[in-house]
Amino acid sequence: MAGKMINKMMGFLGLEDDLEEDIEEVEEGKNTKNDFTDVESIMNSKRQNKVVSIHTTISAKVRIVKPTTYEEAADICDELKNRKIIVINTTGLETRIAQRLLDFMGGASYALGGDLEEIEKGVYILSPSSVEVSSDLKNELSAKKIFGWK
């Protein structure tokens, strides 16, 4: 019973070893004794097909923006589409325009799988889906007043 449960879990994770089924099919098709070269080629092809490279060489770039008009929202979202991290300072904008800008960027980040987070009042970070911003970083940036624009 434990063996069946393990096989089901392995199958669910895509790690189930279907080699036994393939070996039986080869044996039935030939009606001969074990042909080890065919079995080895099947085993090697199965193993090679499951190898996937998880290493990527993407470098993160950060852009700091202080928009002056709503029209800059599309350009900022294009940067997000190009997988860049954007820090946006909206302190110089009217409240109504800043809200429209944030709504636009929030929708774009949702559509692209990214994230829009507030660092401090009027300062936001827009990050692509491949970047995770921890709360420690936000607290540190806020405490040090690194983005203390005037």
From Swiss-Prot:
Where does the protein end up? Cytoplasm
> Its biological function?
Cell division protein that is part of the divisome complex and is recruited early to the Z-ring. Probably stimulates Z-ring formation, perhaps through the cross-linking of FtsZ protofilaments. Its function overlaps with FtsA.
Q: What is its main location?
A: cytoplasm
Q: Which HAMAP family match?
A: SepF
Q: Name one GO cellular component term.
A: cytoplasm
Biological classification of the source: Bacteria, Bacillati, Bacillota, Clostridia, Eubacteriales
> Which InterPro entries has this protein been placed in?
Cell_div_SepF, Cell_div_SepF/SepF-rel, SepF-like_sf
Transmembrane portions of the chain = none
Q: Per UniProt, which keywords does this protein have?
A: Cell cycle, Cell division, Cytoplasm, Septation
Record's family? Belongs to the SepF family.
Question: Which species is listed as the source?
Answer: Clostridium kluyveri (strain NBRC 12016)
Instruction: Indicate what this protein is called per its UniProt record.
Output: Cell division protein SepF
- Short name of any one Pfam family annotated for the protein: SepF
Origin, by domain of life?
Bacteria
Q: Which GO terms are recorded in the biological process aspect for this UniProt protein?
A: division septum assembly; FtsZ-dependent cytokinesis
Q: PANTHER family in the record, alphabetically? A: CELL DIVISION PROTEIN SEPF
Self-association and partners: Homodimer. Interacts with FtsZ.
